[in-house]
């Protein structure tokens, strides 16, 4: 079974900064990680390959430094890695990102396209479903369990108050949530092979054979008006006096603010 896994290198959420001029995330010089939900997608793809055979290919779109994320994916157990990188991709919204990724996916034979539910730097959860739409294949989102039965999958999809069990044939796109599994740590051998024996192949806009006006900022119908970080500062208050008085004052204050 051939599985494509889409991963994204995202800023570590503990180090998020906003450019005051462009109102977008500052990514340069910020520690980056593989998007957490994407790791769950990759782990499940590797588990499926271990059960039924096949190949796991990871694909990412981003600047050249995204190669680090792809190397980590190779160390975890992916077989091949491709990086979509080109100035033509810069400034892409979810629609233009899905356009580029779907064009890349069309170059591969695949049974499953796996991606995370959403990226922690945007939280839109749009790219996966948009890719499925552009590829004209079925999709199952919020996946928490996958079983293989021949050429079809039995998938559990999480809901707010329960779950659905869905039977779907391949090819199909799945979006993973953290309840799906616990991603493995790369082994020493895996890390060595990822950096010494495996290659990260580059795909540019020219390789996708698509009108560049449909990519990047030019191909993005969504325009970011503003981005900001929430104020995390909290005012503190100290209640003095004996314990009984302090507790009474605390209860009165909480009541006045309708907390209790």
UniProtKB/Swiss-Prot annotation:
Check the record and name the PROSITE patterns matching this protein.
ETF_BETA
Gene3D superfamilies from the UniProt entry? HUPs
Which cofactors, if any, are listed as required? FAD; AMP
**Cofactor mode of binding and number, as noted:** Binds 1 FAD per dimer. Binds 1 AMP per subunit.
List the CDD domains.
ETF_beta
User: Which Pfam families does its entry note?
Assistant: ETF (PF01012)
The answer, when asked if Disulfide bond is one of the entry's keywords, is: no
Recall the GO molecular function terms of this protein's record: electron transfer activity
Stored SUPFAM superfamilies = Adenine nucleotide alpha hydrolases-like (SSF52402)
Keywords per UniProt:
Electron transport, FAD, Flavoprotein, Transport
Query: Which InterPro entries did the record assign?
Result: ET-Flavoprotein_bsu_CS (IPR000049), ETF_a/b_N (IPR014730), ETF_b (IPR012255), ETF_beta_N (IPR033948), Rossmann-like_a/b/a_fold (IPR014729)
Subunit field text: Heterodimer of an alpha and a beta subunit.
Tell me the protein family, please: Belongs to the ETF beta-subunit/FixA family.
Instruction: Summarize the protein's role.
Output: The electron transfer flavoprotein serves as a specific electron acceptor for other dehydrogenases. It transfers the electrons to the main respiratory chain via ETF-ubiquinone oxidoreductase (ETF dehydrogenase).
- Protein name stated in the entry: Electron transfer flavoprotein subunit beta
